Regions:
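N-terminal, Lys/Arg-enriched amphipathic/low-complexity engagement segments
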Residues: 52-112
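Membrane-embedded segments
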Residues: 114, 121-126, 130-179
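Hydrophobic membrane-insertion alpha-helices, especially the h-region
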Residues: 20-39, 365-369
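Solvent-exposed loop/turn segments at secondary-structure junctions
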Residues: 140-144, 167-171, 204-207, 277-280, ...
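N-terminal Lys/Arg-rich, disordered targeting/topogenic segments
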Residues: 1-14, 388
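C-terminal functional extensions of proteins
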Residues: 265-266, 270, 277, 284-388
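Membrane-interface motif at the C-terminal end of an N-terminal transmembrane signal
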Residues: 31-47, 373-380
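A substrate-binding/cap region within the structured catalytic cores of diverse enzymes
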Residues: 178-267, 271
Length: 388
């Protein structure tokens, strides 16, 4: 009579097959419950660099106060219906150097000094620390963001390589006798900022002030800013303009680099772009479709001209500051607040954290359950042939 020895392992395997699916189901239920517990037990805590963020916000508030006084001294009244918080940092609806339409609510939102805390946080997320090089492209449409960026760089001890364009959209820095670079000079004279612009263009169409109705006024502004010692950029061709700017960025960065060695794009920790001047995306549609916040380099090359695609294609992240109605709430700041929050306050300084001890405990439980599940799965047995 022939003995089939493989029948006994098959009986054991049946019992194992019955237990394994149950354990596997328990494992996945445990994971789902763990995720729920971890999410339910998160707690609110200050960000590790909250004090640096507060330093930037408080300095920005001091800058705004000085600029308000200087604006009034120069004869530009504040319109309460446009600037209900009476910050003095909201321009007029239209002037001789207004380049395009802008959102009044967005401009008002940036008068909150805590925007500097947000920018500091974004810089930290890009890895910026003391002594790092940061390329900066500023329009004059959001003067508050510009000042906040300078204060954020100062608070971190970073080195900004900064170029500004003078033209501004509605309610931006569009006061002909008090443009953004006049604001910078005021702050420099008061010793309130360390980082500042070293070059400028007129902005607007073709980035040369084309379309501004009073070209004599444009020339007056140009001459005034040249008197501050800033280098002037004037290129109608976008490719020439971009090449000249990149040469300036890399050349100026080389002067700031303590190693005194050639500088490449990778030596910049990030690019900050505030506003929507033509050099951001080379006048393409990317300016409209790109999300605000941190843009990370992708696997595929970015299409189009402009500083943002160029830096991304060099592997350098970009902090894009433009669409305030989404960017501010995403970072814990209110949109168009009345009254303004005090500097150093708000959700922007906090983050939600998981409880480490609970994470470790639940992870250990998951590993144990996974091990038990693996043990209950049947192993393959060699086929045993019985003999008579």
């Amino acid at each position: 009579m022939r003995i089939l020895n493989d029948q006994i392992p098959q009986k054991d395997a049946g019992r194992q097959f019955g237990a394994a699916p149950v354990l596997l189901l328990c494992f996945f239920l445990y994971l789902a419950a763990s995720c729920f517990i971890l999410d339910a037990t998160r707690f609110r805590a200050e960000k590790p660099h909250a004090e640096t963020m507060r330093l930037a916000a408080e300095q920005t508030a001091r800058c705004f106060a000085v600029l308000k006084d200087e604006r009034l001294r120069r004869g530009y009244e504040i319109i309460p219906t446009d600037d209900p918080n009476l910050t003095g940092m909201v321009g007029y609806d239209f002037t001789e150097i207004t380049t395009s339409h802008g959102s009044l609510e967005a401009k008002r939102s940036t008068t909150n000094p805590n925007t500097a805390a947000m920018i500091t946080d974004l810089l930290v997320q890009c890895g910026v620390k003391e002594g790092d090089l940061v390329a900066v492209n500023l329009s004059s449409s959001f003067p508050c963001l510009n000042v906040a960026t300078l204060c954020a760089l100062d608070a971190l001890g970073a080195e900004g390589v900064i170029i500004n364009s003078v033209g501004a959209s509605t309610y931006g820095a569009n006061l002909p006798g008090f443009v953004y670079l006049d604001m910078e000079q005021t702050l420099l004279s008061e010793g309130l900022i360390r980082n500042h612009s070293f070059a400028f263009s007129m902005g607007g169409d073709y980035d040369i002030g084309y379309g501004m109705p009073d070209q004599d006024l444009v020339k007056t502004i140009e001459d005034r800013i040249r008197g501050y010692g800033l280098q002037f950029l004037h290129y109608k061709d976008i490719d020439e303009n971009l090449a000249a700017r990149l040469e300036l960025y890399l050349g100026k960065a080389g002067n700031k680099d303590s190693r005194n060695s050639p500088v490449s794009a990778s030596d910049f920790r990030c690019l900050v772009n505030a506003g929507g001047n033509i050099l951001a995306f080379g006048g393409g549609e990317g300016l409209i479709s790109a999300k605000s916040g941190i843009l990370r380099p992708g696997r595929k090359p970015e299409e189009g001209k402009g500083l943002i695609p160029w830096f991304l294609n060099q592997g350098v992240p970009v902090i894009h500051l433009l669409n305030m109605n989404s960017l501010l709430p995403e970072n814990g700041l209110p949109f168009d607040p009345i009254p303004l929050p005090d500097p150093g306050t708000g959700d922007v300084y906090f983050e939600m954290r998981y409880r480490k001890e609970l994470v470790l405990l639940l992870s250990a439980g998951a590993l144990l359950l996974l091990a038990l599940t693996a043990l209950r799965f049947p192993r393959r047995h060699p086929i045993q042939k019985g003999l008579l």
